[in-house]
């Protein structure tokens, strides 16, 4: 996926996670530009949503690069500098799957 805007980058993460995770509700907050996912594991439902979103840290106008962050529940999991036309950061999918798997295994939900 070519990175064109943050909403589509966020959507790509969710689309890829769909195959591995069950969730009961998705809400897109236009004001904060973030998705809120209400996840469940093995039929359990959590009361508080897990928030996964892509935040825009800053632009560098000199070379048109943009720093974006992968955020889970207000914790920055990774930060990447991208340039126009660059591909989706593939390793983000693995980071999220590993992190969410850890959350499930600890039975926090």
Across the structure, where does each feature detected by a protein language model lie?
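Amphipathic, interaction-prone secondary-structure segments
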Residues: 18-72
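Positively charged, low-complexity intrinsically disordered regions
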Residues: 5, 16, 34, 105-107
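Amphipathic alpha-helical segments
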Residues: 5-24
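Ampiphathic alpha-helical segments that act as solvent-exposed interaction surfaces
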Residues: 10-13, 71-109
């Amino acid at each position: 996926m070519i990175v064109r805007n943050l909403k589509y980058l966020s959507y790509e993460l969710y689309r890829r996670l769909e195959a591995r995770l069950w969730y009961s509700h998705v809400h897109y907050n236009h004001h904060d530009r973030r998705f809120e996912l209400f996840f469940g594991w093995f039929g359990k439902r959590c009361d508080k949503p897990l928030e996964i979103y892509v935040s825009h840290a800053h632009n560098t106008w000199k070379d048109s690069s943009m720093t974006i962050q992968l955020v889970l529940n207000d914790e920055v999991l990774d930060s990447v500098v991208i340039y126009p036309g660059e591909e989706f950061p593939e390793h983000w999918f693995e980071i999220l799957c590993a992190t969410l798997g850890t959350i499930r295994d600890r039975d926090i939900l």
